[in-house]
């Protein structure tokens, strides 16, 4: 039985159990209960989540937390910082597996045009101020694509396979998103899980 490590934020938590079930005939899927949040946080905690184990494949994503705006209208992590953090992360991950798959960050929905002053990742109660904000849909998704492209280029050059979850969601965006405009609904999670599982299964077969 192969061993796979699956890492990512709350969206990974949403599709993780489904991925594990879909791959149960070929792999044991190890994943933390904890939200892996932004890239630096994933890097900091990676050894804790991975343990003293070598994996046949590691599949991961980080990005949505990095891309959130702070109250001076700047991203929590600049694009340059995001790329540098991913460079550091890859150096670490390579010590645990030679088969690596990085998943793109998914787009946001049109509800962001109405909720841009509130961060649904942190608190659902609008009465409480939050310092981490989203923005309107077009600006948000433009940023997601920019960060995705920068990381994709780096990872492709370095032999990491890309799992394009952005495109999976984009084709049926409003049908696959929940009411918060950031997290998928059940249909969205099922589509992401199937795509991730198919990607992992294909890479494990080589």
Question: How would you describe each model-predicted region?
Answer:
Residues 1-59, 190-191:
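Serine-esterase "nucleophile elbow" of acetyl-processing enzymes
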Residues 22-25, 44-206:
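Alpha-helical cap/lid subdomain in secreted, periplasmic
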